[in-house]
Structures are given as C-alpha cells and as structure tokens.
C-alpha cells in the first residue's frame, strides 16, 4: 500500500512548476500500476494548449472555473467543480482557467515525472527502466 500527501510532494522533483500551471505528481510510472495521478493547478487568465498524442488523460475539476475547447471542432465546454473531461481520442485542446483551477489528472500510460511538453504540447512516452523504478 502506498499513502502520500500533497505536502510530502511539495518542492520535490515530483512538484512541477511552470508559469501557467503547477502539477504535483502523486503516483508515477515507477509505482508500476498502469496510470499516474497528479493534482494540477492551472492559473487564472492563462491559455494552455495541450495535445497528449501518446497518452489518455482524464481530468476532474474540484476547485475553480474555466473552459476547454476541442481544437479540432471548436466546441467549447465550461468547467467548474464536479466537471470531468476525458481526452479519449488524444484530443488537441485548449484550457483557459477563469480562476485558479485545481484538478486531479489521471494519465495512461503513466508519466514518469520527467516529461516536458514539446512545441505541440505533447508529452513523449518515457519508460521507466527496471533499476530506476526499483529505487
């Protein structure tokens, strides 16, 4: 059994900070459970273009408000506490938080925590090697 708190993750290598968002990686690929879980805060007034070409992501909003636009169709959905969006088709999307928006994100395949969005907003697939995963 693994039990973690957000406080344990803060200011570690599992706490990723950018100008637009902060993501605390709670469960990562090294746990070998087939998914990763993150608590991510997207900052008010930012514009965030993402495309998870190599991952499926589910995002549950539990605080704040914003909107998401499907970049292929132009369809926009309002996001508020209790909203969930599932990027089941590797959808290119844009998230625009109106207020700081706190979310819980689940990725499959799991991320390692070392991924960086490329110029298209894509995370590469990084596979944990056995030795690294054991540490």
UniProtKB/Swiss-Prot annotation:
Catalytic activity: (2S)-4-acetamido-2-aminobutanoate = L-ectoine + H2O
Pfam families attached to this UniProt entry: Ectoine_synth
GO MF annotations, alphabetized: ectoine synthase activity
Record keywords: Lyase
EC number in record: 4.2.1.108
Enzyme class label: lyase
Alphabetical list of InterPro entries matching this protein: Ectoine_synth (IPR010462), RmlC-like_jellyroll (IPR014710), RmlC_Cupin_sf (IPR011051)
CDD domains (UniProt xref): cupin_EctC
PANTHER family to which the protein is assigned, alphabetical: L-ECTOINE SYNTHASE, PTHR39289
Family: Belongs to the ectoine synthase family.
Protein's name in the database: L-ectoine synthase
Gene: ectC
């Amino acid at each position: 059994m693994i039990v973690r708190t957000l406080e344990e993750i803060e200011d570690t290598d599992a706490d990723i900070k950018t100008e637009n968002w902060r993501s605390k990686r709670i469960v990562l690929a090294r746990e070998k459970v087939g998914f990763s879980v993150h608590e991510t805060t997207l900052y008010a007034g930012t514009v965030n273009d993402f495309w998870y070409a190599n991952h499926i992501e589910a995002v549950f909003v539990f605080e704040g408000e914003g909107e998401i636009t499907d970049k292929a169709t132009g369809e926009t959905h309002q996001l508020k506490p209790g909203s969930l969006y599932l990027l089941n088709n590797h959808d290119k999307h844009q998230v625009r938080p109106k207020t700081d928006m706190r979310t819980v994100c689940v990725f499959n395949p799991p991320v390692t925590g070392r991924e960086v969005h490329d110029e298209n907003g894509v995370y590469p697939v990084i596979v944990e090697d056995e030795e690294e995963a054991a540490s």
